[in-house]
UniProtKB/Swiss-Prot annotation:
One Gene Ontology term, aspect cellular component: plasmodesma
Keywords: Cell wall, Disulfide bond, FAD, Flavoprotein, Glycoprotein, Nucleotide-binding, Oxidoreductase, Secreted, Signal
FAD-binding PCMH-type domain location: 80-256
Key word Nucleotide-binding present: yes
Needed co-factor(s): FAD
One Pfam family this sequence matches: FAD_binding_4
EC numbers, comma separated: 1.1.1.-
Signal peptide region: 1-27
Annotated protein name in UniProt: Berberine bridge enzyme-like 26
Length: 537
């Protein structure tokens, strides 16, 4: 594609001479009008205001509806949380370019949202820059599949569920190895790595990106050739909101069989005597055939004295159940899997199943962009385990889980292709040596009067896990944002010092390279948030 046509020289001159004409005392309503006028002057493609621009001063109910539409964590929709001054939903690439020019001109901070799954709400809440504009990419969701060359272009506003559905429309033997949650926005999802149930066979979504279209801090539209290999490296796992606005990804499609097999086998503590099943899983999950992905979900069931921890072994096998049973009998007989437990289906049907929809749910549910679970307030954290957790450690985990109202812990197996890809291939470094990734989640309803107790609980569990997880650094998954690890301030020098800590957690030795690339492509730190990559100074 190369570099798109540059914006008119007049627009650049307007930007230059007007940088100092907007005063901090300008009213928000005035800024809204100026932003609209500026975008209209800097794009050749018309946009209907009633469908693309939403402000509390214009229509409060519509503004709230759009703001809440894809915000996944209700914790960040509370009245006490900062709200954008207004929301702009572009429908064309040039609108994104113009928005960058105009937000710079008006000295307004910009946040960008594709699917709204940021665990700390950073794609739609700013606590360090106010006022701010929310650019919502949900109207840019085209998916173009090319089966002949095993590729697809997908715009950032599309969900992974939409992408999977459109692939299956064209072919029953092609897929893409990205997220387990079908409502994830593909734009931000891939920037953090994008793991899914085929990661052991094909790696991450970010490992299977061929090209991208981004708009940089100068409002230029770039593809891989134009942005250069450093920037292309950075955006595939270096997390969103740092290097530019991702408009679209070109992805590599991977082969899948016509028939796959899924199962979910749930055990209580009483059924797993001596923790033999979970202990065996720790020893074999990363060593099983690459076609088999078995994750474990820890929940709490029952009440009062009957309360217990359950472990659900939730799996996808790229093949039929006969072959799967042979693998399980040989490698993991302790689970006691039976033919009755196994369900054969298409790869697309398995997406809905793994996402949490009931078996036999029509696959067009994936086009709705919604989770099968109700929205709640939640806090999450992550870890990586490199040696099996001993019996004593497991007992302590179970005791912690039984103390919380709605706890969830998920163990996702690594190994396979994940162990073959070098740590520096893309910014995502969690590769060889990782047995499994841990996700901790606690959630609560809005009616809960003491949300702080849930956050204290998860921090206590995280502290308890210290001896059993990676160290120096204690690794974390950037798509499970955790501001407990640290956050940026407006002072760039202070930012860099603080960022070295959480940067090592997320990116290990890749963090310095990310900061150097940031300094080259966005030295003024236009794209920033509480955990964005700061420019190296």
């Amino acid at each position: 594609m190369g570099i798109s046509k540059p914006l008119p020289l007049f627009s650049i001159l307007v930007l230059y001479f007007s940088l100092y004409t907007i005063t901090p005392t300008s009213s928000l309503a005035s800024l809204q009008d100026q932003f609209i006028n500026c975008v209209q002057r800097n794009t050749h493609v018309y946009f209907p205001l009633e469908k693309t621009f939403f402000a509390p001063t214009k229509n409060v109910s519509m503004f709230s509806q759009v703001l809440e539409s894809t915000a996944q964590n209700l914790r960040f929709l509370k009245k006490s949380m900062p709200k954008p001054g207004f929301i702009f939903s572009p429908i064309h690439e040039s609108h994104v370019q113009a928005s960058i020019i105009c937000s710079k001109k008006l000295r307004m901070h910009l946040r960008v949202r594709s699917g709204g799954h940021d665990y700390e709400g950073l794609s739609y809440v700013s606590q360090i820059d106010k006022p701010f504009i929310l650019m919502d990419l949900s109207k840019m969701r085209q998916v173009n599949i090319n089966i002949q060359d095993n590729s697809a272009w997908v715009q950032s506003g599309a969900t992974v569920g939409e992408l999977y559905y459109r692939i299956a429309e064209k072919s029953k033997v092609h897929g893409f190895p990205a997220g387990l949650c079908s409502s994830l926005g593909i734009g931000g999802h891939i920037t953090g790595g994008a793991y899914g149930s085929m990661m052991r066979k094909y790696g991450l979504g970010a490992d299977n990106v061929l090209d991208a279209k981004i708009v940089d801090a100068n409002g230029k539209l770039l593809d891989r050739a134009a942005m250069g290999e450093d920037t292309f490296w950075a955006i595939r796992g270096g997390a969103g909101g740092s290097f530019g606005i991702i408009l679209a990804w070109k992805i590599k499609l991977v082969p899948v069989p016509k028939t796959v097999t899924v199962f979910t086998v749930t055990k209580t503590l009483q059924q797993d005597v001596g923790n033999k099943i979970i202990s065996k899983w720790q020893r074999v999950a990363d060593k099983l055939v690459e076609e088999l992905f078995i994750r474990v979900l820890f929940n709490v069931a029952g009440t009062g004295g009957n309360k217990t921890v359950t472990t659900s072994y939730n799996a996808l096998f790229l093949g039929g159940k006969g072959t799967l049973m042979n693998v399980m009998k040989k490698s993991f007989p302790e689970l006691g899997l039976t033919f009755k437990d196994c369900i054969e289906m298409s790869w697309l049907e398995s997406i809905a199943y793994i996402s949490g929809f009931p078996t036999h749910t029509p696959t067009n549910v994936l086009l709705q962009g919604k989770s099968p679970f109700p929205k709640v307030s939640f806090k999450a954290k992550s870890d990586f385990v490199k040696t099996p957790i001993p019996e004593s450690g497991l007992q302590g985990i179970f005791k912690k889980l039984l103390k919380e109202d709605i706890p969830l812990m998920i163990w996702n197996p690594y190994g396979g292709m994940m162990a073959k890809i070098p740590e520096s291939q893309i910014p995502f470094p969690h590769r060889k040596g990782v047995l499994f990734k841990v996700q901790y989640v606690t959630s609560w309803l809005d009616s809960d009067k003491r949300p702080s107790r849930h956050i204290n609980w998860i921090r206590d569990l995280y502290s308890y896990m210290t001896p059993y997880v990676s160290s120096n650094p204690r690794e974390a998954y950037v798509n499970y944002r955790d501001l407990d690890l640290g956050r940026n301030t407006k002072d760039v020098k202070t930012c860099i010092k603080q960022a070295q800590v959480w940067g090592a957690n997320y990116f290990k030795n890749n963090f310095n390279r990310l900061m150097m690339i940031k300094a080259k492509v966005d030295p003024e730190n236009f794209f920033r948030h509480e955990q964005s990559i700061p420019p190296m100074m």
